[in-house]
């Protein structure tokens, strides 16, 4: 696995070379090695504590990756997702896509505590999220990439935005495409970032609609997933009734502990767990998405390269830089 990761890393050198800096909304750049002088051990502190957290709870890797996704899709990559409800401001944590679903806040809290001890008011919570996502992917066998740093933290959260912009597990393909386009992301980004579902788990409430047999008289196409009756029965036994809505099943049934390309192999076999996974193939009437899914299924290196490119794009959505926002002392609250 280490050899494979090194091979992909070498394939990404050209990509890194052209992304050593990215401008924020007001012209201040995100940079490689942003904390080299102000907090030289920042990236090492994050890396070490992500390693500890994932060793203790392997599922935490997917949870931390998901945290950055849910942050960037609401207001931008500004750590607004980490803010608790305070006064008149409702936390994004309470929004429907996040409630009883997002995890890993305590890991970010502890890393922030250590960074404040080492370098007070220097490393932003939004940069911690970006580094944590990268390190989590790498720890599960995925690619490594240079995270450009220098983000600052927002002064507000958007409960309404979290309900509006975070894709639902039962999203149609059209709604996913529109949702990603609103963030400046294209169809290739949608496919590549969906590959993050190669790790992690989902609750029964998120996918039990996929288990119920359709009324074939009202169905214009056969959901490939439903042809796998054994797969369906196994999942159905976990989600018999509403009392089991919080039971968990791996998003990738084949290699749930590894960040690899099996998610795309599963899609081609009709074994995507969520509706929003399956529609990448079942609702792609033109075949463009199916072709890319097939390419990723047979070429893991290509998936890794495109995934990194899309993560870099996502990590730069509406970032705050320069004098915008602040560096929070505590990721859960704006500074007083």
From Swiss-Prot:
InterPro entries: Haem_peroxidase, Haem_peroxidase_sf, Peroxidase_pln, Peroxidases_AS, Peroxidases_heam-ligand_BS, Secretory_peroxidase
Record-level GO BP terms: hydrogen peroxide catabolic process; response to oxidative stress
Binding site for substrate: 167
Binding locations of heme b: 197
Cofactor note: Binds 1 heme b (iron(II)-protoporphyrin IX) group per subunit. Binds 2 calcium ions per subunit.
Site annotation Transition state stabilizer: residues: 66
Cofactor or coenzyme needed: heme b; Ca(2+)
Residues annotated as signal peptide: 1-24
Protein localization: Secreted
Family: Belongs to the peroxidase family. Classical plant (class III) peroxidase subfamily.
Protein's job: Removal of H(2)O(2), oxidation of toxic reductants, biosynthesis and degradation of lignin, suberization, auxin catabolism, response to environmental stresses such as wounding, pathogen attack and oxidative stress. These functions might be dependent on each isozyme/isoform in each plant tissue. May be implicated in the systemic acquired resistance response via the salicylic acid signal transduction pathway.
Protein name: Peroxidase 20
Organism (species): Arabidopsis thaliana (Mouse-ear cress)
